[in-house]
Amino acid sequence: TQQYEYHVRHYGHPSKFGYKDICALWKAENFDAEGLMEKYYNAGARYFMSQGTHHDHFFNYDSKLNAMNSVKVGPGKDILAMWKAAADKFGMPFGISEHLGASFAWWRVNKGCDKTGPYAGVPYDGNDPAYQDFYYANQEHGTENPHNAFPWYTENKEFREYWLRVMEEMIECFEPDLLYSDGSLPFGKHWVDGSDSASME
């Protein structure tokens, strides 16, 4: 794929240099949340939404549930907290977008390996058990058709429970005015009575 070729050109082979290593390269040394928020406010914005996490399972805040986050890896900054403080300064409601729900199934591409060439059969770094918490033990989704985005959501019960804990963590840490999920609210019937014990099935 074009993405594979770009990765090899710019970073090296994914069996040797994977996404976890790319995350460590991100420094955000010029990131100025307050300066940007001032520009947005002056341009007419009256609310702000920051990304908490995308499909890559990297968190933009100091999570206790996921060590692959912007405080412990890469920038050394709590990006979400900085955005929240800037929004508060300008009196703007603050929202968080999360894209974690699809990550378990989507991340199956990191379990593959080249079928030809010098690295044929050498597992990509997503197979490294030392990073299983980040890359997931998601072999159940296979790697035969990595370009098929479905299933969008996994049936894996442990991951569903993890997703819910992450949502609770973000809400408790940042008290957002809005929490946006990418797509329909994940995993069908859950949270139906508003309690922690509501069905996740």
Positions of the model-derived regions?
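Mature catalytic domains of secreted/periplasmic carbohydrate-active enzymes
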Residues: 1-201
